[in-house]
């Protein structure tokens, strides 16, 4: 019986295979029950990330399950303190990481029904963390980005709950976490998980709407995502979406659009794409779309049309947000790694995962937008065999089964084409579409046809009728850009007629006829050919068959930027007199000339009678090219010549040749003369380049080479003489009109010239236009005469005009003829011409410009037969390979020209006397050429009309912006004098308004805040600016001295008794300018500072500052010497005595060579920037920025040291007080609104935009102590804008007692600072500690108030700085000690840190406080009803922790602990567990009673893992 029972009790025997299977099943079941974070199938292994997280959780699982919140916090802090005390940072970081991961894992696995437990874990983690949850948020972001779709339902819900908690606590990483999780709301996905996540996020945003409104960068991202989700939810299948949720989404988006439209504009053109789609689906968005088109200004003040948004490219992160991280990774893998031809299987995998359902087709437009605008392949990918972007887009379009989504996908593809601007948009955004059309022509012609039909039939015709022209222009720009950049070589194969069909191809030709060429380089030449064909089709005007369109020469680069000056009335009258003399001379020559010799027979058909010239003239206009749009003009439209400008209008010849001009030819178009030389450079040719040669003696090789060049460069042009290109009426304007052919003669508008004689015929075989210049006479060749003498007209040289005869004489092989000029101008002495044989021809190897060679004076030639013409002639016969002359050296610009006496008017042909032997004729000729070229550069911005009323206070040259730096001071002085003597108020107001308008235009570049053009900080503080003239005229030096003296007298008082007066007329101008440019406010502030005693000194010229003699590094002296030497206008000099002498000498040179120095004045800002960039430091490795900062700081310190307690901002304060209507009222309390303080803050914001605010803070606090000390708004501005370097500088100045920040308002400022960001609180407390070091006891006095307002979780920086303050103070008393001990458990670390410090460093004082508490406890019988009992327990508790932490150190414990008193307290207690609770303390004071306590509880042991009572943290830290 016993054996049978034993056999029944034995387990059944199993085979090894069965045991192995059982073990595997148990392990799998264990993992399935333990690892619940990610979704796993039965065959899947546990995720390595979850395994590691689970191990971290297991280490604190027992603590989390068996302890209260306070016990968890105490254990973690004690454990963290013990790890940190070991000195091993790696171990400390590992412990922090493991605890953080454990809490995150515990929260993720928490049940949504037990939110309290998750909240407790999150609160404990917040209390424990030492990096403000930075590690926690980084782990959470990585989890969401990589594995969110693998999470189970409960962790997914907990992730949303964690984000909600981060938003509730206003954590700094909540925006990034929110943006990442929004990417996991899939488009075209109607699963329950996806819809639930969408609704949860929407409810979260609705709950925290105030937080969302404070996040302007997050609002557009959320709006774009939910607009895209509404697009799916509207077209949802029946029953897959809750209508209530859809209504909430619509209302949420509409609310954001109506209230935060300005923030949403950053989305750009894709916002309009979504709104246009939704307007056709819902009534709400339809009404919004109507309001957006009819009343756009109601949405945003500066928003006038949706075209603004359509011209704004959508930033990449918006388009990226609609693809999940996993989807984006797979798309990028195909575009970066898969070779062309192998992409089919990858496409199939992608379709299987993301594009299975019909609803998922809405993802295709998002993917196309991502491919076009987000991913731009680098060059090595473009050059490889990787699958191109256009192939993937073509596959996506083929995948669209629905016509609606297919059309919407094509709109996504061409969205960037509609308003394409090359300067704003990227060509990579439009490249896939054009390559898709070009690459699909051969194999997939239907794709190309479909896309072309979409462009022509939908986008250009019916997409937006109201903005049809703008869309056509944008598509035109797109095609022009892809052709220009060489994306495709031609559009002929993109629009094949055979594939498109007749009707579609006709539409294409209608819209894109100008692009249907073999190469975009020949577009302009094709226009010329079409123009010639039109001329051939006009039988009534046969003379126009060979007449080409006259093109403007390509803009030549001037040698310098010297600007021509206006002619005075006296000079204009002299010019008119010379013009009359010219006409008389021409008439006399016409009467003396013989009949012209008939040309050879083969040239007769090319001659044209002069009576047909008026019909030819309209054909000479150059076709206009719109640079901004890239459009060529309609060649069928006649070109109308603009009327000539008046002689008083200041026009530069290069105004039409500026790169921004709208009538420039393209870069590929060049205008050649008969020799094949680009006429853009004719003005630089030397006298030996072109020789005068009759037509009959020209070599055949010259003619053939010319034709070959023309055939290569451009279509054949009809050869036209210069005379035939003149105006029919022969009224020759003095200046070139911007959109007119070159003016070939010079005359005055007031002098009517006679028409040319009927026998004036000039052949046009080998003549071509040579130069385009204003007020120039160009002579034409006479091919019928064997030799001739060019008769130059009189030269009228005025400040605004230059004569061209010298240049034309240089183009001849003859020396130039003498010209007449005004006696007030510099004339050019030219020797008489000498006839030379016509066989002179210069080869291509000949030098073009030889200024060293001086032509010898020649005798007057014999009279010869001239062709009867009203214009002198010139023969041009040079080889077609003439190189361009080299640029002239700057030293050639300073050649002095001595004006000779004018020749008698009665003998116009009499040669002038020979020049003096010392005069360099060639240099004079060269100088004339230089002056001509230097006068043809004039910016469009300075061509302004000066009102006549302003000419009463200055001349036109003085009002030129290039001279305004020097002349504005005298202009303002004349203005003040004029106003004071003008009794008529109306005239005063008119003069003031005119001067204000002028100054607002001239000073716009200087006063308009633009980070791209704003001068550097060093220039702002150390260089003279034009606006300083106005400041000096408004605040006179006398007023400044009165202000300084008054302020010094009143330095002991808190308010200024008197304020300086200002010049009222100038103040009115300054006030109006301040309304336009608010930056004037802080510029007055800076000017008042740097011009105070100890600052910059003004030089004698009134437009230059001298840097004070400040002791600094030698490196700055050397660099500044070079800087001041190179800068004649705005330099800052380091050595005042030597540099001031140099400055005075430069001023003398400036008065002598005023015209040459105008160019320097035109580049004041450039010189300032160059001067700063030229600062070098060879002795130390200091960057230029650091040197600039050092220089500014030394200057400001010099000003403060030199002024003491004087208010150096009196002018600035007076300016704002006058703006407010008078003297400033007494300052209100600092926290009350003050208009002057508001103005100061506004100006400081403007100063912060250029980086100057930080330097002004100490002076502002010192000068406006009664206004700014204790002001929270100004302090917040300082803290939010300050950088660490300036903060350190300000704290040093506060600690030295130079100024105060808090004053008597410390409590209110601290109270408000609790709402600020953590770094702002940290900066504030460092400034408060600095001020407390001067005014001792500030913080200690308000310690109870501060500690009562503190939140240890949100104000950890404040707690840290408060700890530093209490450690350093010598004024802590018994009240502070007792209040610190009575703080709650959340301040455990703070209390223990202070208790340990006081006990070790202030042993005697702390020891007395503790004994005092113990004595009171022992003497009080009713000790259970007062706070003394709690104080005793805290002291015992911290004594015990102190002994445990520092037990191994050699400390004389008798000086810190009174064993008798402690033992009495322990014995008197009725708690039986007291000795076990304070075992470390009990073993020290009661060794006999602690014998039963285990040895490992000795205070010398630092580890407590082996302690029985430490095994349960809940029991260990339980409070009585």
UniProtKB/Swiss-Prot annotation:
Ranges of biased composition (kind: Polar residues): 626-639, 736-752, 819-828, 1489-1504
Location within or outside the cell: Nucleus; Cytoplasm
Extent of Low complexity compositional bias: 527-549, 557-595, 613-625, 642-669, 694-717, 725-735, 768-789, 837-882, 1116-1130, 1137-1177
Annotated GO biological process: RNA polymerase II transcription initiation surveillance
Renumbered residue ranges of the record's region Disordered: 1-23, 523-671, 689-801, 813-922, 1116-1177, 1489-1520
GO cellular component, as recorded: cytoplasm; INTAC complex; integrator complex; nucleus
Sequence ranges of Pro residues compositional bias: 596-612, 898-918
Superkingdom of origin: Eukaryota
UniProtKB keywords: Cytoplasm, Nucleus
PANTHER family, alphabetized: INTEGRATOR COMPLEX SUBUNIT 3 (PTHR13587:SF7)
Function: Component of the integrator complex, a multiprotein complex that terminates RNA polymerase II (Pol II) transcription in the promoter-proximal region of genes.
Family note: Belongs to the Integrator subunit 3 family.
Quaternary assembly: Component of the Integrator complex. The core complex associates with protein phosphatase 2A subunits, to form the Integrator-PP2A (INTAC) complex. Component of the SOSS complex.
Protein name: Integrator complex subunit 3 homolog
Organism: Dictyostelium discoideum
